[in-house]
């Protein structure tokens, strides 16, 4: 789910979440029923809509949180980007061995001093319900222009972070480029973020 919690952690912390998967108000929708020829067994398939039904269980804000943006920087990039693409495809080494970025519904972006700059609370609830905080891709030439448009800001991660290896560390140049422009912050709030793995 995110850098601190798996699905199991969320359900352990809030056991009432399970109620959303049963009963008349279940977010699971029955999509297929088939009886065996001898009527001794029944196959039932359920569908779960990740957006908006499932994802809405894991955030509570209505408006995006805005802490300190935009950064004040004399070298502000005034380019009008249409999305943000961050390449995080490398294997990163540290004292505990090598690690690769793990997929997650919610990520955080940190600077090299592990100061947090971005998390799910900073994304609008409308964007989270529409398509989530971000999209992952293995395609370096990512082509979903609906998400990031034709002129995305392209950055390369310095490293990854978090208990579950889901968060991104950007160098100072990238942090300044991303967070010194209010248009870029709006792109993040709108979920126009793609991570290339």
Question: Each predicted region: which residue ranges?
Answer:
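Domain-level marker for long, solvent-exposed, non-transmembrane regions
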Residues: 1-197
């Amino acid at each position: 789910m995110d850098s601190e919690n798996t699905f199991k952690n969320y359900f352990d912390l809030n056991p009432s979440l399970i109620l959303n998967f049963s009963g008349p108000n279940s977010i699971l929708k029955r999509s297929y029923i088939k009886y065996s020829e001898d009527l001794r067994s029944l196959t039932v398939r359920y569908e779960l809509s990740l957006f908006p039904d499932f994802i809405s269980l894991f955030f509570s804000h209505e408006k995006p949180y805005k802490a300190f943006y935009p950064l004040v920087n004399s070298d502000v990039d005034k380019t009008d980007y249409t999305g943000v693409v961050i390449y995080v495809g490398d294997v990163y080494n540290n004292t505990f061995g090598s690690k690769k970025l793990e997929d997650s519904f919610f990520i955080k972006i940190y600077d090299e001093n592990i100061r947090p700059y971005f998390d799910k609370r900073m994304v609008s609830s409308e964007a989270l319900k529409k398509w989530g905080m971000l999209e992952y891709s293995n395609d370096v030439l990512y082509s979903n222009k609906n998400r990031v448009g034709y002129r995305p800001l392209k950055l390369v991660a310095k490293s990854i972070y978090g208990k579950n290896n889901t968060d991104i560390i950007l160098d100072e140049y990238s942090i300044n480029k991303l967070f010194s422009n209010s248009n870029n912050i709006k792109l993040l709030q709108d979920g126009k973020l793609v991570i290339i793995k």
